[in-house]
Design a protein with these regions (language model features):
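Flexible, glycine-rich active-site loops centered on histidine and acidic residues
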Residues: 2-14, 70-142
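Distinct, well-ordered alpha-helical segments
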Residues: 47-48, 77, 148-149
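A short, small-residue-rich loop immediately preceding and capping a beta-strand
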Residues: 61-67, 92-93
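Short, intrinsically disordered, charge-balanced linker/junction segments flanking boundaries
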Residues: 151-159
Length: 159
C-alpha cells in the first residue's frame, strides 16, 4: 500500500526544524510521497525550495508539487522542475492547477479569476515543449520566448 502525505500550512508558524523532521520521518517510515502545495501567502514552505531540499535529503521518497504557475515564468519554471527531477533521480510528481481560490492571493499574483484557465492553457504546453529539448519560439500577450532551449531536461519523459 502506498501512503502519500500532503503538507498544508498549519495554525502556527513554519519552521525549518519541523520541515526537516517531517522529511526525515517520512523517508524513515517508508511513506511513498510528500506533496507540497503552492500557497504564496500561507506560512508554508515553497514547493520548489522544499522539494529541492527533500531531494537532497532523501533517496526514495517521491516529491509531489501541487503548483500554481500564475506569477511564474514558464521557462524558469520548466528549468527548476527539470532540475528537481534530475537532483532526485526522477522522483518528481507534478500537478499543475489553475490557481488559488482566494481573491487576495489571485490579486497578489496579478491574475483575475477569469483568466486562470486561459493562463494554464498557455503554460502547460509551453512546459512540455521546454522539457522536450526543442527550441521554443513563442510570442503572446503574456510571454515572449525568442528561440530558447531549456537544459537540463527532466529524467522522466514525460514529466
Amino acid at each position: 500500500m502506498k501512503v502519500r502525505i500532503a503538507v498544508a500550512p498549519g495554525g502556527g508558524p513554519w519552521s525549518a526544524e519541523s520541515y526537516c523532521s517531517l522529511v526525515d520521518g517520512l523517508e524513515a517510515r517508508g511513506f511513498d510521497t510528500i506533496w507540497l502545495s503552492d500557497l504564496p501567502l500561507a506560512p508554508a514552505v515553497d514547493p520548489m525550495v522544499g522539494l529541492a531540499f527533500a531531494a537532497a535529503r532523501t533517496s526514495r521518497l517521491k516529491l509531489g508539487a501541487n503548483l500554481v504557475p500564475i506569477g511564474r515564468n514558464p521557462m524558469l519554471l520548466a528549468k527548476e522542475l527539470a532540475q528537481i527531477d534530475q537532483l532526485s533521480g526522477g522522483r518528481l510528481l507534478l500537478m499543475v492547477v489553475p490557481g488559488v481560490g482566494s481573491p487576495s492571493e489571485r490579486e497578489a499574483l496579478g491574475m483575475p479569476g477569469a483568466d486562470r484557465g486561459a493562463y494554464l492553457d498557455e503554460v502547460v504546453p509551453l512546459l512540455r515543449r521546454f522539457w522536450s529539448g526543442e527550441v521554443v519560439e513563442h510570442r503572446s500577450e503574456r510571454f515572449s520566448f525568442p528561440g530558447v532551449t531549456v537544459s537540463p531536461r527532466p529524467v522522466q519523459d514525460p514529466l
